[in-house]
UniProtKB/Swiss-Prot annotation:
It comes from Phenylobacterium zucineum (strain HLK1). The gene is rplL. Keywords: Ribonucleoprotein, Ribosomal protein. This is Large ribosomal subunit protein bL12. CDD domains: Ribosomal_L7_L12 (cd00387). GO terms for molecular function: mRNA binding; structural constituent of ribosome.
Length: 128
């Protein structure tokens, strides 16, 4: 424990330039980057106009579960079919926490297929 406290004291004594150099050295040594990840989706424009400029068609869509409906068990099963990375608890939380994004950055065809499956299971769904 004393070693950690000493390390904290040593790091606290570094100047900004020394801390920046330490950061670069650790990035090189560990093969990582301290850069903040780039946001995937931008917020809609304040004007409320079209999301894409005229002449350009939107190519990536987000499937949003707006309500789980009365048949939540069926909806949870379909969510897990669409998102196999989710466990039962995560899928249940997604359905009960609607509105939630089910899947992001998908093609129009895939978004329509997901919407159809979820609506057949009893959910209310939007594509954005």
């Amino acid at each position: 424990m004393a070693n950690l406290e000493k390390l904290v004291e040593d790091l606290s004594a570094l100047t900004v330039l020394e801390a920046a150099e330490l950061s670069k050295m650790l990035e090189e040594k560990w093969g990582v980057s301290a850069a903040a990840p780039v946001a995937v989706a931008a917020a809609p424009a304040a004007g409320g106009g079209e999301a894409a400029p005229a002449g350009e068609e939107q190519t990536e869509f987000t499937v949003v579960l707006t309500a789980g409906g009365d048949k939540k068990i069926n909806v949870i099963k379909e969510v897990r079919g669409v998102r196999p990375d989710l466990g039962l608890k995560e899928a249940k939380d997604l359905v009960e926490g609607a509105p939630q994004n089910v899947k992001e950055n998908v093609s129009k065809q895939e978004a329509e297929e997901i919407k159809k499956k979820l609506e057949e299971a009893g959910a209310s769904v939007q594509i954005k």
